[in-house]
Each structure stands twice: as C-alpha cells, then as structure tokens.
C-alpha cells in the first residue's frame, strides 16, 4: 500500500466502487478512521469496522449502492493534496461542488472535517479530497 495512506484509501474505495465490491480494506490510522467516519455520516458508505490481522489493524469499509441499479453512492472521489504537491485553503476559499451536493474533506488544526464545519469554525487547512 505504500506510505500514502490517504491516497491508498481513496484508490481502494474508487476501485471497489468500479468493481462493485461489497467491502474494501484499508490500513487503520487516525486519519483514515476520521475520513471513513465523515463518509459514513454523510451516507456515502454503509458501514465501517476495524479488524486486526496479527499486528496489523485494517478498516473494513462496506460500500453503499443504490438498490435497483447497483450504482455506487460515491460517484466521484478525487484525491487533491498529494505528498508531492500539498494544497491548502483558508476558510473563505474552500471550494464547493454542485451547489453543496458534494463534500470537501480537509485536515485542519482542529482535526479532519468537512468544508461546512471548517467554514462555520472559520478554519482553513489542507484540502484532502472531494467526494460527490
């Protein structure tokens, strides 16, 4: 998986959606837990649980699909701030998508949060990913 756990998580979710997988497993870190909890709160994924294999902890993310068409709830998930090029934004310049239909996940001094919370608390930070 490499050292870029956020990138690995986003890629696993994207590939799982494309292959219509029921679950995907990503390394359990504080950041991946926070991102998974935000996706769960917003209804983009069905469930998150933690599993341990010997000394390695993994998050098991249950993906969510529409019942009849089996289309994934996450249409697009895009990784923005990469290890080679960090992207930062203050609270006034945080992007919004499709008239608040999607979410922006940021890493701020107050933790990992969505764009709405960051604007309300007037904190900026590193733009991690877009989800819609």
Swiss-Prot record:
Species name: Zygnema circumcarinatum
GO cellular component terms attached to this protein's record: chloroplast; ribonucleoprotein complex; ribosome
Major localisation: plastid
GO molecular function: rRNA binding; structural constituent of ribosome
HAMAP family listed in its UniProt record: Ribosomal_uS8_B (MF_01302_B)
UniProt key word Plastid: yes
Function in brief: One of the primary rRNA binding proteins, it binds directly to 16S rRNA central domain where it helps coordinate assembly of the platform of the 30S subunit.
Record family assignment: Belongs to the universal ribosomal protein uS8 family.
Protein name as it appears in the record: Small ribosomal subunit protein uS8c
Biological processes annotated in GO: translation
A matching Pfam family: Ribosomal_S8
């Amino acid at each position: 998986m490499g050292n870029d756990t956020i990138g690995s998580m986003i890629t696993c979710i994207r590939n799982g959606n494309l292959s219509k997988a029921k679950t995907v497993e990503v390394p359990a870190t504080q950041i991946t837990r926070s991102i998974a909890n935000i996706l769960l709160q917003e209804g983009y994924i069905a469930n998150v649980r933690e599993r341990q294999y010997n000394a390695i902890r993994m998050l098991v993310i249950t993906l969510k699909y529409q019942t009849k068409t089996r289309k994934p709830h996450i249409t697009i998930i895009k990784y923005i701030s990469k290890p080679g090029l960090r992207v930062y934004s203050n609270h006034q310049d945080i992007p919004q998508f499709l008239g608040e239909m999607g979410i922006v996940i940021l890493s701020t001094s107050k933790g990992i949060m969505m764009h709405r919370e960051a604007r309300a608390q007037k904190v900026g930070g590193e733009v991690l990913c877009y989800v819609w």
